[in-house]
């Protein structure tokens, strides 16, 4: 499949909008980390045959654990997950509460990347 990747500019815009609504410092802590996070799924696709959920999980884990932003990394992780799914014909079906718990689990190392990918499979559908 020809995947549509999350664009850095799109993610930065969504991150800024989220922080404008919910509060926080919108600065980028480390642009190199952000670039690295955004390349994780592409590298995964180049060397393996992941499905949409594994690629979405790669974005999520990278953002939630590498902290490229000063604030809002978990929110950015969820935004990138949802954006990747939408760009590739899927959408999240989980409630906001369930999605928040899942992201907190990823950020706290209670949910692995494989487990989050399984969660995405269970909580998404075709658009």
Name these PLM-found stretches:
Residues 1-127:
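FIC/Doc superfamily catalytic core
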């Amino acid at each position: 499949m020809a995947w549509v990747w999350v664009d850095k500019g799109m993610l930065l815009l969504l991150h800024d909008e989220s922080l404008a609504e919910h509060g926080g410092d919108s600065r980028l802590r480390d642009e190199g980390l952000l670039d690295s996070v955004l390349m994780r799924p592409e590298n995964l696709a180049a060397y393996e045959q992941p499905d949409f959920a594994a690629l979405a999980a790669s974005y999520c884990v990278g953002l939630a654990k590498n902290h490229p932003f000063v604030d809002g990394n978990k929110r950015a992780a969820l935004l990138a997950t949802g954006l990747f799914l939408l760009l590739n014909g899927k959408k999240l079906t989980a409630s906001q509460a369930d999605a928040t718990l899942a992201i907190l689990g990823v950020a706290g190392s209670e949910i692995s990347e494989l487990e989050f990918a399984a969660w995405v499979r269970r909580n998404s559908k075709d658009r």
